[in-house]
C-alpha cells in the first residue's frame, strides 16, 4: 500500500501540469488575438481602396510611388501610436479653419511633417510606407527589394547605397515621429552593418544620426569616429555636414595628429580661390587665377571639384579649356569619371567620355565607374518600365552610357540608310537630321537632351520644317526656312547640320538601343497614303502606334506652350524651339 503522501504529491503534480498546459493555451490564444488585431489594423492601411471611406488624412510624398504620392491614413490610429503625430493633428485641429482635401480629408506634406530635417534627408515613398505600416500593425515587414537592392550582381546588398539609404530614411522618419522601438531597431541594424558600408555612405548615416540626436547617440558616436579616421577630405566633409559636426571632426583629427594645425586639412588659399570661382560659375575667373602661376587645374583637383559640386555646364567649360588631365586621380584614387559616376549626371559622364576619360580605370579598391554607378542604383529605378515618351531614370541612363563606353564598339557610318540615300542633297540631309532629332526628343527625351546639350544644338538656329506656315513672332529669329527654293547652304545651315550630326553620332555611340529604334522608324517607307490593302497588319499597327505617340506628344507640347503664353498657331509638322537648359 502506497503512502498517502505519494497520492498528494501526484495530485499536485497533475494539477501543476494542467495549469501549465492551460497557461500555454491562454498565451497562445493571446498571441493569436494580437496577431489578428495586427492584421486587421494593417488591412486598413494596406488596402486603401477598401477603407477609403474611413481615411481622414493623406500624407503627400514628393515623387510619390507609382500612380500617386498620397498615402491615406487614419488620424486616430497615428495619434494613438505616435506622440509627434498626435501633436501635429491636435495643432491643426485647433487651427481648424479648413485644410481639408476635396474628399474632406486632411492633406499633409511629408516635408512639412519632417521639419527642417526633411530638406537634408529625403524620405522616400517606400520608407514612409514601412514606418506607417509599423504604426498600424506593430510589426516590421520585409524590406522592399526594389528600394533596398542595388543593380550590382556581385553585391551582397548589406552596405550598398540603396540598402543604407533606405534604413537611414526609416530611422529618420521613426525618430521624428517619436516611435522609440522602431528607432532603436533600425539604429541597431545600421550599427551591425557599419563596417561593411562604403566610406562615402557614412556621411549619409552620420547626417541622419546627427539629426536624430539623443535617440541615436550610439550610432552618432560610432559614425563620427569612423569618419574622423577615414580618408574623406575636408572639402567633401564641409559640403556634406553641418558646421558643428565639422568642428568635432577637425578637433578629433588634430588630437590624433591626422592633420596639421596650420591648414587643418584644407587645401591652400590658391586652390580655395579656384574652388570659390567654380562655385560662382565663373570659369573666366578660373582662367585668370591660373595665369598667376600659383597652381594648376590638376593640382587643385578642379575637375573633380566641378564634377562633384558644380553645375554640369561648368564641367563642360572647364573641359573646353583643355588644361586638365581628364584621367587625373585625386588622393583617394578616384578619377574624374569615378566622381561623375557617383553624382549620376548623364551629361557630365558623356562630356568626360568624349574628352577621353577611360571607363576601364579602377579605384584603389578595384571598382570601375560602371560598378560605382551600379552600387548606387536601386533595382526599382533600373528595371522599372519607362512609359514611351517619358524621360528615362538618370541612374539607369548612366549605367547604360558607361557599359556602352566599355564595349568600345560604337556604331559607325551614316546615321541610317535614309541619310545615306540623301546623298549630296544638303536640304535632304538637313531635313533628315531635323526629323530624326525631333523624333528622338519625343520618344527618348532624356537621352536626346543629353546628346543635344553636348552637341550644343540650342546654340544654333532651328529650321522651319512646315509647309509655308509662319512661325510665331517669338520664334521668327530662331528658325530658318528650309522650304526656300532654290536652297542655298548658308553659315547657319552648316552650324545647325554640324550640331545635329554630332547629336546623332553621340546617340549612336552612347545610346545604341535608342538609335536602333530611330533607325527602323526613319528607314521605314511606310506612308499614310501607302497604307492600302497590301500593307501587313503588323506594319499598319506599328504606324498607328507611332502616330498615337506623336499626336500625344504634340498635344502635350501645345498645352505647355499655351500655358507659357506662346502662340499655338504654328504648324503641327514643326517642332518648337528647344528650351535652354535651366
Swiss-Prot record:
GO terms for cellular component: cytoplasm; nuclear body. Salicylate binds at residue 436. ANK repeats lie at residues 229-258, 269-299, 301-328, 332-361. Salicylic acid (SA)-binding substrate-specific adapter of an E3 ubiquitin-protein ligase complex (CUL3-RBX1-BTB) which mediates the ubiquitination and subsequent proteasomal degradation of target proteins. Zn(2+) binds at residues 150, 155, 157, 160. Residues 553-563 have a biased composition (Basic and acidic residues). Keywords: ANK repeat, Cytoplasm, Disulfide bond, Metal-binding, Nucleus, Plant defense, Repeat, Ubl conjugation pathway, Zinc, Zinc-finger. GO terms for biological process: defense response to bacterium; defense response to fungus; regulation of jasmonic acid mediated signaling pathway; regulation of salicylic acid mediated signaling pathway; systemic acquired resistance, salicylic acid mediated signaling pathway. Residues 391-526 are annotated as: Salicylic acid-binding core (SBC). It comes from the Eukaryota. A zinc finger (C2HC NPR-type) spans 147-161. Pathway: Protein modification; protein ubiquitination. Oligomer in an uninduced state; disulfide-linked. Forms activated monomer upon changes in cellular redox potential. Interacts with TGA2.2. Interacts with NRR. The BTB/POZ domain mediates the interaction with some component of ubiquitin ligase complexes. This is BTB/POZ domain and ankyrin repeat-containing protein NPR1. Residues 564-574 have a biased composition (Low complexity). SMART domains: ANK (SM00248), BTB (SM00225).
Amino acid at each position: 500500500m502506497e503512502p498517502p503522501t505519494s497520492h498528494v504529491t501526484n495530485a499536485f503534480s497533475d494539477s501543476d501540469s494542467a495549469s501549465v498546459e492551460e497557461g500555454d493555451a491562454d498565451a497562445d490564444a493571446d498571441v493569436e488575438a494580437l496577431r489578428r488585431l495586427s492584421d486587421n489594423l494593417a488591412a486598413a492601411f494596406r488596402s486603401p481602396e477598401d477603407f477609403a471611406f474611413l481615411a481622414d488624412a493623406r500624407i503627400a510624398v514628393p515623387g510619390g510611388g507609382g500612380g500617386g504620392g498620397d498615402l491615406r491614413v487614419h488620424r486616430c490610429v497615428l495619434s494613438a501610436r505616435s506622440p509627434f503625430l498626435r501633436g501635429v493633428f491636435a495643432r491643426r485641429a485647433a487651427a481648424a479653419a479648413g485644410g481639408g482635401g476635396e474628399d474632406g480629408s486632411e492633406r499633409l506634406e511629408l516635408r512639412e511633417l519632417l521639419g527642417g530635417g526633411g530638406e537634408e534627408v529625403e524620405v522616400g515613398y517606400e520608407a514612409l510606407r514601412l514606418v506607417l505600416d509599423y504604426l498600424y500593425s506593430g510589426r516590421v515587414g520585409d524590406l522592399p527589394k526594389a528600394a533596398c537592392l542595388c543593380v550590382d550582381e556581385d553585391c551582397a546588398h548589406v552596405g550598398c547605397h540603396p540598402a543604407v539609404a533606405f534604413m537611414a530614411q526609416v530611422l529618420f522618419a521613426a525618430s521624428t515621429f517619436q516611435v522609440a522601438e522602431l528607432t532603436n531597431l533600425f539604429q541597431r541594424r545600421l550599427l551591425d552593418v557599419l563596417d561593411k558600408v562604403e566610406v562615402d555612405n557614412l556621411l549619409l548615416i552620420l547626417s541622419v544620426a546627427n539629426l536624430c540626436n539623443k535617440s541615436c547617440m550610439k550610432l552618432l558616436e560610432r559614425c563620427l569616429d569612423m569618419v574622423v579616421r577615414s580618408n574623406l577630405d575636408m572639402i567633401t566633409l564641409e559640403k556634406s555636414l553641418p558646421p558643428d559636426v565639422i568642428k568635432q571632426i577637425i578637433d578629433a583629427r588634430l588630437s590624433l595628429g591626422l592633420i596639421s594645425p596650420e591648414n587643418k586639412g584644407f587645401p591652400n588659399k590658391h586652390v580655395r580661390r579656384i574652388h570659390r570661382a567654380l562655385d560662382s560659375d565663373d570659369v573666366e575667373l578660373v582662367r585668370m587665377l591660373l595665369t598667376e602661376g600659383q597652381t594648376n587645374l590638376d593640382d587643385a583637383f578642379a575637375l573633380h571639384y566641378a564634377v562633384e559640386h558644380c553645375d554640369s555646364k561648368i564641367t563642360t567649360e572647364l573641359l573646353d579649356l583643355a588644361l586638365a588631365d581628364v584621367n587625373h586621380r585625386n588622393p583617394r584614387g578616384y578619377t574624374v569619371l569615378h566622381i561623375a559616376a557617383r553624382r549620376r549626371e548623364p551629361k557630365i559622364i558623356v562630356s568626360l567620355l568624349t574628352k577621353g576619360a577611360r571607363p576601364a580605370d579602377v579605384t584603389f579598391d578595384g571598382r570601375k565607374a560602371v560598378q560605382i554607378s551600379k552600387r548606387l542604383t536601386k533595382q526599382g529605378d533600373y528595371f522599372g518600365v519607362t512609359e514611351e515618351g517619358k524621360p528615362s531614370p538618370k541612374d539607369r541612363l548612366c549605367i547604360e552610357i558607361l557599359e556602352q563606353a566599355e564595349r568600345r564598339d560604337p556604331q559607325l557610318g551614316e546615321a541610317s540608310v535614309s541619310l545615306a540615300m540623301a546623298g549630296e542633297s544638303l536640304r535632304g540631309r538637313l531635313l533628315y537630321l531635323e526629323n530624326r532629332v525631333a523624333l528622338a526628343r519625343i520618344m527618348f527625351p532624356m537621352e536626346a537632351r543629353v546628346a543635344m546639350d553636348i552637341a550644343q544644338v540650342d546654340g544654333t538656329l532651328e529650321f522651319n520644317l512646315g509647309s509655308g506656315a509662319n512661325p510665331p513672332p517669338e520664334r521668327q529669329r530662331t528658325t530658318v526656312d528650309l522650304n526656300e527654293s532654290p536652297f542655298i547652304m548658308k553659315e547657319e545651315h552648316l552650324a545647325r547640320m554640324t550640331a545635329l550630326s554630332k547629336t546623332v553620332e553621340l546617340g549612336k555611340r552612347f545610346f545604341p538601343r535608342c538609335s536602333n529604334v530611330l533607325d527602323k522608324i526613319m528607314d521605314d517607307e511606310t506612308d499614310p497614303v501607302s497604307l492600302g490593302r497590301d500593307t501587313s497588319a503588323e506594319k499598319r499597327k506599328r504606324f498607328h502606334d507611332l502616330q498615337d505617340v506623336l499626336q500625344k506628344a504634340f498635344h502635350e507640347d501645345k498645352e505647355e506652350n499655351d500655358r507659357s503664353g506662346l502662340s499655338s498657331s504654328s504648324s503641327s509638322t514643326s517642332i518648337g524651339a528647344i528650351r535652354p537648359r535651366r
